[in-house]
Amino acid sequence: MKKLAITMGDPAGIGPEIIIKALVHAKIRGSCRPIIVGDRTPLEEAIALLKLSVQLRVVQSPEEYRAAPKGRTIELIDMGVAKKIRKGKPTAEGGKASVHYIQKAVELALDKHVDGIVTAPISKEAIHMAGFKWPGHTEMISELTHTRDYAMMFVGGPLRIILVTIHTPLKKVPSLISKDRVVKTLRLAKKACEMLGMKSPKIAVAGLNPHAGEAGLFGDEEIREINPAVREALGEGIPVAGPFPPDVIFHKAYRGEFDLVVCMYHDQGLIPLKMVAFDKGVNMTVGLPIIRTSPDHGTAYDIAWEGIANPASMIEAIKLAAKLRI
């Protein structure tokens, strides 16, 4: 079984709760060997909150976690950085702790001590309060792994989407849609299909404009940038079609006509995916030298530490990480 490092995320959010709920779930116990990278105090508080009979086994070195734990025992690398955190709010302390967890997990994965990482939600506000400037997990991990070409991808229900631009204001998106950027994303889309074990994938490209530009009447990015990118990708042997009108392509993918949709911007892809898999969507980063997945939701401070957080997305993120291959 794959060993997976599960980062605890922001201790003030729902991360500790959904991790504990996920790791005692029957679908997870037999699918992988999880090791939490986090802090003992919040996890013990989460176990007590949930009234679960679970034991934490603290390990500090790779040698210690070569022997699989027995029964309802969960392994933890105790970072010792979040003993007193104000719950339900973004804080500099929580932001700093969540970054430390990620740094440790990435180190373990790069050194081949674990086979992949699954990251619980962090708060962009909290990590900025702690003095870090990354926009989010994806950019942070790409820097930690010295990765230049990467993409954010989401899996949920029958849909899989990959983004050409990530956390970009909508008004800036058109200026970022270039042939080179789209080709790069198409190459990563092909890699994603390989990671998922697809032998004959069908990749679609969504247009940027209404009706995919309608031959230039509603915008010419399709003519200038996206069409040339599709032609170049086809020349490289990438199985791609499009660009398709954005209001049509997701229905085609939902029916199984395509395995993966390349989307021009964040909400173009995330809105349809969350319509069909709001509670079970998974974020994965493509292009890294390591496997990384994450639940497709945030810290949910508003319901944190009430015992009501839904672990479904975390469960799916762990299951997907256990199946992926580099």
Where are these regions (language model features)?
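Conserved hydrophobic/aromatic beta-strand scaffold that supports enzyme active sites
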Residues: M140, M152, I161-L163, I290-R292
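Glycine/threonine-rich beta-strand-loop-alpha-helix active-site module
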Residues: M129-A151
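A generic local secondary-structure boundary/capping motif
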Residues: Y65, S142, Y150-M153, E194-M195
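Contiguous, glycine/small-aliphatic-enriched amphipathic segments in soluble metabolic enzymes
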Residues: M1-H137, D180-M264, Q268-K274, F278-N283, ...
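Ligand-binding beta-strand-loop-alpha-helix segment within the catalytic cores
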Residues: F154-V183
